[in-house]
């Protein structure tokens, strides 16, 4: 199977499963605990009925919309995803170029494998930076200032990841960042030689927004759950979010809002948007 034979989401998923070592595939494909939330997220699309109105003249269709004051040609954008270079050696560079091709916004994770500076030099379409609130205040300030200097349009503070999700697939496969060989994963990596060749020859794996402050994730192997549980500030509250919103001074969103009450609080502290999300069921099942 190749890309030209992929015609829907399931085709792409099957191709990824064939191309990626098991720990890498199950990290991106999996979720927390029994994955009930994850499966409900997927099946929910089957519950949506579309009732089209006809005879409207569709020779010219406009899908554009405005988000955070930016006009996008599509009514959706690329949400931030961590560690993209693990899935393909071009990582965020490829996704950013795709977002620019279709004139939509590109979300960059704090755990990205390409820096905000490089992304800014690569594309000129709208960009969002997703931010995790770390215990290290110097790291927090650095992330905000670098994104601001790189002229990112939106800052999104993730608020549903106070601790790491219990991702049972990762426990079974031994997934870490950066990847390491274990007895459980050795065979899987050995049977995907092209992934290994690309990983070793296409530039060093690094987390450029974090590596000057923490070793974990770049030079020291760690699970994502352990990283979140030890590095993120579990005392984060509404006062912290309000200060960050003021410090950013531009479009600011909270990512992970699930209740009307919290949505109203987000408006009260100055947010210009919210991202209604359960993190794909990857944090709380």
Language-model features, listed with the residues they occupy:
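Glycine-rich active-site/cofactor-binding loop and its immediate structural neighborhood
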Residues: 72-111, 116
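A gly/proline- and charged-residue-enriched helix-loop-helix capping module
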Residues: 101-122, 126-140
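Alpha/beta enzyme core
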Residues: 83, 97, 118, 122, ...
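A generic secondary-structure signal marking the coil-to-beta-strand transition
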Residues: 46, 68-76, 125, 153
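An N-cap/entry alpha-helix motif that binds or orients negatively charged groups
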Residues: 1-69, 178-236
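Hydrophobic faces of well-ordered beta-strands that scaffold small-molecule active sites
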Residues: 76-79, 104-108, 127-131, 155, ...
